[in-house]
Amino acid sequence: MTLGTDRARFESSARPLVETQLSTVAPALREAVAYALSVGGKRIRPILVYRAARALGRDDAPALEHAAAAIELVHTYSLIHDDLPAMDDDDLRRGQPTLHRAYDEATAILVGDGMQVQAFCLLAAAPGLDADRRLAMIDVLAAASGFPGMVGGQYLDVSATGGALTLDALKAMHNLKTGALIRAALALGGHAAGAPARRGHPADPAPALSLPPGGCLGSAR
């Protein structure tokens, strides 16, 4: 399987799950979500979800598409909010107008908020898993995207604006801001595939999978 094959799988199988969930949403809001999801992107996180499951021989696990869509929604929402005037104030994302420029700030905030919530709705409805496993997946994504992870890293980034960071501080920031979701992608793929969890840490199958921590990937992005 190539990266292109996994990327095509996401577009044909995981992304439609999001579109189905939005079928009753106001057309203009649905259009803004579609715009945000269509602006380029390598789909690295959903690809890692697929690759983790494939390493376990469970590339066909029914929950994989929900996990892949969920983590890409969280990643996309983070970019939308990161681009806002209160954060990085970016006009372009991957060569295209950022969402708040293509639409407006209020729409961008609402789309980001909605994407974050929909990610957890997808995990709560992931097929082929028992309730404990779904809760473990929700726990993984919540920790990776919240204060102990991505949000905490973004705060360190914003707080350092105009100042100088030591190499250790820079590593810590990227370990949270980017590395946390990389680790979560691998863990979600493991959960979707039924990987055994570490004793005492039911939300974390990574040790059983011998997965890398993701911090260096976060620093090298």
Regions found by a protein language model. Name each.
Residues 19, 23-221:
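Mg2+-dependent prenyl diphosphate-binding active-site environment of isoprenoid biosynthetic enzymes
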